[in-house]
């Protein structure tokens, strides 16, 4: 079984983290709960106010409410909030993305304030969306926070560098083994490892869902564990639950496309999920790869078509 969920004194210092519930909700993908907690919590210092607002606006970004972030974060706002606004600007304005990345490149080439963890995370997020994982990793390696390391683990797993991901996970475990982010990273690495580790990953996702909330992130994590073990029907139930919560969540739709193929569902079922994904997330990497393969297939068909 997974270790017990961490409490608000996690981090080794014994001090109470006033933002524990806000952060925890964000990390497990419970974005509305994060917003609610952020608006309700009473804080003891201006620095904590800024940190609270960072998570509040990042939760709005996760809900694709870019306008809220762009309207409310002003030029006079703290540098951490300016970084969140930069990412909101990137996500909201496709036509401006190249210029935003170019400006970010210039900032990264100068002396960066490595204590501004939010800037490093937002820079890495932009580079990742821009299909530049190397630049994302360079940004993250300048920070030493648990969240920077957790994001590094995610990127390394996407690059099939399980060996390096394990090393980063070890760093997280040495820093704070019981932290929510460390537990999630442990589940991601276990899922990528496969075999008997799949059950360990499943227990972590399940325990978090039971103790906190069965979020889209956790439901998809559980479903991925089932799919990796060939338990397609069990995965389908979890993915349907996720679909009921949000019919446009990209990971749910990608997993349902894969699952439909394995269960031999009619082609129209797979195509329906594919259309939903295209409508909601036309620049999603899965869609780009799918369209590239479609184009390759069309070229092959023309190549071997009988001449008139």
UniProtKB/Swiss-Prot annotation:
Membrane topology: Peripheral membrane protein
Gene Ontology terms, MF aspect: structural molecule activity
GO CC annotation, single: Golgi membrane
InterPro entries hit by this protein: Coatomer_esu (IPR006822), TPR-like_helical_dom_sf (IPR011990)
The keyword Protein transport appears for this protein: yes
Annotated SUPFAM superfamilies: TPR-like (SSF48452)
Family recorded in the similarity comment: Belongs to the COPE family.
Summary of the function given for this chain in its UniProt record: The coatomer is a cytosolic protein complex that binds to dilysine motifs and reversibly associates with Golgi non-clathrin-coated vesicles, which further mediate biosynthetic protein transport from the ER, via the Golgi up to the trans Golgi network. The coatomer complex is required for budding from Golgi membranes, and is essential for the retrograde Golgi-to-ER transport of dilysine-tagged proteins.
Self-association and partners: Oligomeric complex that consists of at least the alpha, beta, beta', gamma, delta, epsilon and zeta subunits.
Record protein name field: Coatomer subunit epsilon
């Amino acid at each position: 079984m997974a270790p017990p969920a961490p409490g608000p004194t996690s981090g080794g210092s014994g001090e109470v983290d006033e933002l524990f519930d806000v952060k925890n909700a964000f990390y497990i993908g419970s974005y509305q709960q994060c917003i609610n907690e952020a608006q309700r919590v009473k804080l003891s210092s201006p620095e904590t106010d800024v940190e609270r607002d960072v998570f509040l606006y990042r939760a709005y970004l996760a809900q694709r409410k870019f306008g809220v972030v762009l309207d409310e974060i002003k030029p006079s706002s703290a540098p951490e909030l300016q970084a969140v606004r930069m990412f909101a600007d990137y996500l909201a304005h496709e036509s401006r993305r190249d210029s935003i990345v170019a400006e970010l490149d210039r900032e990264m080439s100068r002396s960066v304030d490595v204590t501004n963890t939010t800037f490093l995370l937002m820079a890495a997020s932009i580079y990742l969306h821009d299909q530049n994982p190397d630049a994302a990793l360079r940004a993250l390696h300048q920070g030493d926070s648990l969240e920077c390391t957790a994001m590094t683990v995610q990127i390394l797993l996407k690059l099939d560098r399980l060996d390096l991901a394990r090393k980063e996970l070890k760093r997280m475990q040495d820093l704070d083994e019981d932290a929510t982010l460390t537990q999630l990273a442990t589940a991601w690495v276990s899922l990528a490892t496969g075999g008997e580790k799949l059950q360990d990953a499943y227990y972590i996702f399940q325990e978090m869902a039971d103790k906190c909330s069965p979020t889209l992130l956790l439901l998809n994590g559980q479903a991925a564990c089932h799919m990796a073990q060939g338990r397609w029907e069990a995965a389908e139930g979890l993915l349907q639950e996720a679909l009921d919560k949000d019919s446009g969540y990209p990971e749910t739709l990608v997993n349902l496309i894969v699952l439909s193929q394995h269960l031999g569902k009619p082609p129209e079922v797979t195509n329906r999920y594919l259309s939903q994904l295209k409508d909601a997330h036309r620049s999603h990497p899965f869609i780009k790869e799918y369209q590239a393969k479609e184009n390759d297939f069309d070229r092959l068909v023309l190549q071997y078509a009988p001449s008139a």
